[in-house]
A protein has these predicted regions:
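Hydrophobic alpha-helical bundle cores within soluble ligand-binding/oligomerization subdomains
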Residues: 1-190
Length: 190
């Protein structure tokens, strides 16, 4: 009985939010789903020419251009922006690859709801929203997998946040990590 935004608050503040804090966090993530125009152009250029994960990896790296390097204690706002930005990028990549019209982010919606709306091009059902919230919560609690390890190694060198997440996305694309899910889905579809 929780949402992804509540878990983000828990990770961010080390405590569950009250309604005011939850509303504030939901709004901040929503605002972050609006991508810079230059990044939208990068996605449009690459989406049909490279794999989805290669496009996403490049986009995460390019998003780093818009962020200045900050001390470690100032990383949470950057990470929060990436949560919103990655959702929009993934939806755009999918829709461009399927030759579907793009759906603009709606910062007033919850994260799972807006991501599904941008991805599917229609209003998601409450069941779909709850399922995605649950999936995102499980991912937030995934612990120590290969992509997390990769991000930690990169961050451990004091590289910036976008470099660490770019490394994680690259690792996730491998057939023995996230790529395995892609192959399983292909088999299910066949």
């Amino acid at each position: 009985n929780t949402t992804f935004e509540e878990i983000i608050c828990l990770l961010y503040d080390i405590e569950l939010p009250n309604q005011e804090r939850l509303d504030s966090m939901t709004a901040r993530i929503g605002e972050a789903r609006v991508l810079p125009e230059e990044i939208q152009k990068v996605i449009t250029e690459l989406a049909g020419k490279t794999s989805p994960m290669s496009t996403l990896r490049t986009v995460v790296s390019a998003l780093g251009h818009y962020e200045k390097n900050v001390p470690l204690n100032e990383l949470p706002p950057k990470a929060l922006r990436l949560v919103g930005q990655i959702a929009t990028a993934v939806a755009m990549i999918h829709r461009l690859r399927e030759d579907l019209p793009l759906i603009e982010a709606d910062p007033k919606r919850g994260h799972a709801e807006d991501f599904l709306r941008m991805l599917l091009g229609k209003e998601p059902s409450q069941t779909q929203i709850e399922a995605l919230d649950l999936y995102l919560i499980l991912l937030a609690d995934h612990g120590f997998n290969a992509s997390t390890f990769s991000a930690r190694v990169t961050a451990g060198t004091l590289a910036n946040l976008h470099s660490a997440i770019t490394s994680a996305v690259g690792t996730l694309s491998g057939p023995l990590h996230g790529g395995a899910n892609e192959k399983a889905m292909e088999m299910i579809i066949e």
